[in-house]
């Protein structure tokens, strides 16, 4: 169980760091767009300001903000694809760990549970050997059952 917790925490740390990387690329993209807007002249800024207001109104009226250029759309698709891949990998690791844990538990249950009694133990318990029956001894003696 400790190994399962460690694997889960490791996957969680990877996911958080990945999401931080995605967030930082979005911030960098926004900064690049702002730098491009700042390089225009003052008359262009006024015209751009009116256009930006219209774009903002349109953007808020719809649920999805359209990308500004082809590169940002491509970058967004790459981020979405890598996020889906990461979560698919996490789900795969969780499934494999659950299956391995189940197999190990099953292996423990099916281990040889029989105690082989020597002649002295058999005489002490007064047991008749019969494959289909259960054999019991006193509390201080050995105990074995056929399952």
From Swiss-Prot:
Intervals, Cytoplasmic compartment: 100-147
Residues carrying a glycan: 37-38
Regions that span the bilayer: 79-99
This protein's UniProt keywords: Glycoprotein, Membrane, Signal, Transmembrane, Transmembrane helix
Topological domains annotated Extracellular: 25-78
Keyword flag Membrane: yes
Membrane topology category: Single-pass type I membrane protein
UniProt signal peptide: 1-24
Cellular compartments annotated: Membrane
Claim: Coiled coil is one of the keywords in the record: no
One Gene Ontology cellular component annotation held by this UniProt entry: membrane
Protein name per its UniProtKB record: Putative uncharacterized transmembrane protein DDB_G0283807
